[in-house]
């Protein structure tokens, strides 16, 4: 059985306990924590909520778009994106330069003659679901620049 620490913390206050003490107490009072602890979201950093402010079709590609995104840092960032669902006003998950998604570190990259200074992400790329049909579509509830782990509560420890 897998249990989310975020879910358990809705019922129990863990303030001041480190992971080792928490595992010990959980094993004594509830159930043994078996083989491993999975750190959901631990391989994700620098990914934030961003809003697409402009979209232009790439002059030499039918699939690529040239975007300007607002990642909440006071400037617009140029991004090259091939997702079919890009549109002005869409809020999405955005990996800034320096962000890490698993083993991938985001760097400025030249794509079809244009520099992309980040990456708009699908749900699959950030580990929320297997959906890779387009970039994430996020509600307007979150301010630009909000850490995606905070917005989607994916910074979690899963006990087995």
What name fits each language-model region?
Residues 1-160:
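Phosphate-backbone binding interfaces of nucleic-acid-interacting proteins
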